[in-house]
Amino acid sequence: MKKLMLAMAMVAAMAASAEMKVGTVDLMLLVRNHPNYDSNKALLTSTDKDYQKKLEGVKAEGDKLQEEGKKLMEQMRNPMLTAKAKADVERELGEIQQKLMGIEQRYRSEAMRCRQDLQDLEGRLLKTTTDDLRKRLAVFAEKGGYDFIYDVNAVPYAKKGYDVTDEMLKALGVDPKDAKGRDEGK
């Protein structure tokens, strides 16, 4: 917020001394229409599916142990079991319970790690995309003679005439009428 106020103060001060060219851009719309957006989204989806398969494998391991435990419980109900056989079954049940607790703990930690890895990947992909967009915006601003181009979401109000999003979409090779996410949130 302090940066926004400082930027606004700078704009006001500079506007008083000279005519400035200012523009706004919808950065999220540009991200959704960046050439890498679909491949990044596909990578995130496939990575998520890989993580889900890994977690399903751990869950299947736990399910198998639970079935073994159920069979042992059925044996425990047999009135014909000797005391030694009953003790052996109880020992096996205890071992299965310990293994199940280990699997449950492994599942939780693996799920957390997968979720964190996915968030990290998403963050890296978004940073790469926004860095590229910032470079493209700098080139666009330089060519167009703009003094400032602000993200429309960081400015409380701007006239529609300042919006250069359509020009940036064209620079990305996207027809503004076909832009993904144009009407989302409206």
Where are these regions (language model features)?
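Hydrophobic h-region of N-terminal signal peptides that target proteins for export
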Residues: L6-S17
